[in-house]
């Protein structure tokens, strides 16, 4: 069946914040099996799209928006098998799955950043936005959305990295093809 070009106009969306939606195992944290257990109820509401806040591996500095593993589900939310089951059951009910997939930045615990910050000449050195100090201080006066400077100094490199949000969320240098391609591949894998 061919999908209408403007299908998005007909969506009735229900947003789920997984952490607080439905706990399936009694640990006090909502999870993917919990969401799965409520699909019949959500379907009865008449929704045709489920919007999920981040469920990827994250140290959770910013409620999952600081992703350290784009191809892994956060342990407290379940497994990739749980994810696959949720998607399959949603699709059986005619429910599209929309995800918050953060591609502007990663966690400072992501393997790319851990390598990038070690030196100026490693294979991942330009994966993030780095700048030299200006007169011994931040490169400019840009502010973070969360307050304070948008720049954080890393002694190993002798440079500042840019973070629009938390200092735990360094911005990716998306102008580089070798960054956009792996990021695009992560998008396609879902």
Give the positions of each predicted feature.
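Single conserved hydrophobic/aromatic residue that forms the stacking wall/gate
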Residues: 177-181, 185-190
């Amino acid at each position: 069946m061919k999908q209408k070009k403007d299908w998005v106009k007909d969506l009735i969306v229900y947003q789920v914040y997984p952490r607080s939606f439905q706990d399936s195992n009694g640990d006090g944290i909502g999870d993917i099996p919990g969401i799965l257990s409520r699909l019949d109820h959500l379907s009865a509401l008449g929704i045709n799209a489920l919007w999920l806040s981040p469920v990827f591996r994250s140290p959770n500095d910013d409620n999952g928006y600081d992703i350290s593993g784009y191809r892994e589900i956060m342990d407290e939310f379940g497994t990739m098998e749980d994810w696959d089951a949720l998607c399959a059951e949603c699709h059986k009910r005619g429910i599209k799955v929309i995800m918050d997939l953060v591609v502007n930045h990663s966690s400072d615990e992501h393997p790319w950043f851990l390598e990038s910050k070690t030196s100026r000449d490693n294979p991942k050195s330009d994966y993030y936005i780095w700048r030299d100090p200006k007169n011994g201080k931040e490169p400019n006066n840009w502010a973070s959305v969360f307050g304070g400077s948008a720049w954080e100094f890393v002694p190993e490199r002798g440079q500042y990295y840019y973070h629009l949000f938390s200092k735990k969320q360094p911005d990716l240098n998306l102008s580089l093809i070798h960054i956009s391609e792996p990021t695009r591949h992560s998008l396609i894998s879902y």
